[in-house]
Amino acid sequence: MAPQLKILSNVIERLKNINEGVTGHLYGVMYNNTLTVLTFSINVVDDTEVNINHTTLQLHMPAEVYLCGILHVGQCEEKLPDSFQDIDITDNPLFFKYTHNSSKIDAYFYIHQKLEAVDDINVINENDIYQEFTYIRLRGSLPLIMQNGNIVEVLEETRKNIASGKIGIQFPSKNTFLFNNQNDLKDISLKELLDTSEPYEGNKNVKKGMMQATGVVDAVNANILLRISGDRLSEENIKCAPVLQYVKRPFNSVECNLLIDTLSLANFNMSSADLYGVLVESICRNIKLIEKCFEDQLQNSEIMKLAISNHYKPQNFGHLLTIVYPNGYTDKETMKYRESLHRILGLDMTKPYFRYGNAVKFCNDSQVENILFNPHEAIQQNYDTANNSRKIGIVQGLYAYHHYMQDNFDDNGWGCAYRSLQTIVSWYRLQGYTDTPIPSHSVIQKCLVNIGDKPSNFINSKQWIGSTEVGFVLESLLGVSVKVLCASTGEEVSMLAPNLLHHFQIQGTPVMIGGGVLAHTILGVNYDEVTGDVKFLILDPHYTGSEHLPTIINKGWCGWKTKDFWKKDAFYNMCLPQRPVCI
């Protein structure tokens, strides 16, 4: 029987951005006779510098996401039976055809050496995925001892030991353990294993019945346990006597710990026995990526650096990817690899997606506890989607909410523009454009003194700054350019809505606005081109409380404001930071 077919809506949206005839591959999850397509790759014929093909790309996917089909965009020629040979997840591979002009989608399953059309294609969104699946982030440290540069051989042996089941898995939030030999644990489902009726385990400020944390990824934490001793009743122990071999010779030895950080996408109804196999597979994928990282280093350098795993989710991508870089490599040193990933995944070549700063933040990460990311995502949307004249532009990507009294620093009454500037800098950091730290008030003041904008007594003062100074600091510290919009009254701010709409659609950066003695951050605009009605999505830096998302949303510290929000007798300047063109 042919499987049921589900396709993530992000896949279709990404296909719309491909303007030429190409072939590629599909990747998805097969569970309970339902194939869910999550992503695709493109066959790149001229990428000779970095060897990333459809099979190695699968290693970057969470475990349980496999190569599942073939993709044709536009007019293509390819022998389908030959193309299906690398697909193991199903006996009925998927053939997916997308036509540009009509945005037509045709899907076929390859059954008994014939293509059978799929009549019912269920297009789903990310929230639908999370109703059935959850990410599991498995981490641990594996000891390695290498001699005379045999690192690849040692990694292969380590992978074989892992695959043979010589590890255990711990779920710390529930104090639950999973082993290869489950004599004492009945074969329960993942949902039962995690007991998901318990309070949300991520951000401490987000508890049961409250808003979910925004801008971060929620994943189940798991740890790797190494088996130190053998099973007491193992046949190996009964039949074999210990043997000690002593060889005296000179050799070079290196000892280190291999850091494992890997992902799985598991169905809540998956049995614990199957789950163990999936988690083992995730470790093996991670080790293979680490092997490739070391092999690439051996070809280009005599100095070896440990491999570090990072997880990424490009904007509108729909799922996570794992990428391994040599520890300490700069963005310049990883550029060729990142460019190849952009090409094979059909991503924009003018924006960075896989720099260190682009790595996702998890709810369980310690740094997430002290700051909120993208609080506007928690606002209930009530847009009139049927109104074709209403246009909406929203900040693109991640930012951190900076406001009064953070960092144990009292700037209540004078530091609002400083905090808005910090929010903007956080956007550039989280999009991978810079690794410059978030500037403190003192650093901002020193910068303005150094460029000659302020006198020396400005440092350590409580003097305000405005949008002009914000632009100076951005240009000086980050090297980015800005544009400035001016409104002589609060009513004129609404007249600049088309300019703001264009900014958010093209640049996507937060906008700092200053008027009178107040500064705010504009995150978006909702504009009706016919009636002129406009609303502004405002992030207010004057908030003095803790990082409590429900309070921030319900009390209006982050929310949509009408044109009456702006004072009629105030003069306003807006600083519109520009997005660099780079990868």
Predicted regions mapped to residue ranges:
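Short coil/turn segments at secondary-structure boundaries
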Residues: 122-123, 148-151, 156-157, 183-184, ...
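Active-site-adjacent substructure of cysteine-protease-like catalytic cores
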Residues: 11-117, 125, 134-144, 150-154, ...
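Intrinsic disorder
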Residues: 407-418, 457-468, 491-495, 507, ...
